């Protein structure tokens, strides 16, 4: 009997450990700002991608493929990962995601369901953020979603949407008001829904009825329906790492102090200032310095309040502007590691060639074909990749955090400001390549060359700082 009891204890401990690991790795974070909430009038999507293990960043410029009906897109890729990649396509549609565990335990799939396919199809075919929601919704309803749950943050040069999907075939999406900004840790953030308001909501018609059927929601006892509370897995919805990061970001954006109850957090808020790219970067770099609930962690810079963590493998700020040709107006500022120790480098959607070291395959189609199959021993097989420069720099900083991080951040700050100052001048130099009235490109080859060279030269200068 004693032996059986011991085995039960060990089994329970193992289960709790695995559960903690699963929660521990859910660290992604996103911020989405409408065009009237930003200083320059752009829609902005900021995102931290957090994953453990050996990760290798690649950034491809994938050309159109008429045979497959796919458009041109910029692809931030992590080989072997189904939930890490981000996309920015030729229509200025950007997508990234955060894991959001749901209560759903029923598996309802056709042909194995979908997961990675949601983001790839958006990147390849979406003509707008609203169209992306339609594509994703139809795919989920047809095939079934095989992850526990996830929120896809989608934006174009005019608007932003949040697409929340649950295991199986249920989903709901909400448009962010143009004058607002919203943040997403690793739980659902959509609250009240109104599917009759098709300008601002989309979703499966039975999203409320299904919750009633499962016993998750009782209208008489529970009051108003809050999707985030009803469909979120309880431990994730009330997990301190989630609500503390949420509080921290909301404070950055509004200057107000929030409590620890996620029920009270609005879907979106009006910022206390018009936001700039640098504001989004500041949030992605945050270690929770602005919240009292910051909890000590085994490593000094890392704790449950961190938005930027030791496993942040990429941070991106998509700056999407509708008054420029999309090749120039849609761009992403991105890093190769934790943003607290990196500068964000600009990539334009009109680029056609990645700087040296950012594509492990010369042909993007080979990268697509081998995304899952060729994902082992990446450093051994691709030792010259630029990815390892970022990885090695991060490890070096962590070996002497107190001694190095201050100097690194100071030099990064100066370099970042130099890039901000140079952006306007560079984009003015591109005016000769398009018609100012129609916004049509008049010299595609020279524009592409200028965009390719611009980012490549920045990296050459940046890597000298490593």
Each model region followed by its residue ranges:
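Positively charged n-region of N-terminal signal peptides that target proteins for export
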Residues: 1-4
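Bacterial N-terminal signal peptides
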Residues: 6-15
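Sec/Tat signal peptide C-region and signal peptidase I cleavage site
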Residues: 16-21
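A contiguous strand-loop segment
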Residues: 22-115, 135-268, 272
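Second-shell loop/turn segments in exported
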Residues: 107-108, 117-126
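Short, well-structured alpha-helical segments that form the helix of a local strand-helix-strand
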Residues: 132-141, 280-287
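Substrate-recognition/cap regions that form aromatic- and gly/pro-loop-enriched pockets
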Residues: 293-421
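Histidine-centered catalytic/metal-binding microenvironments
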Residues: 398-466
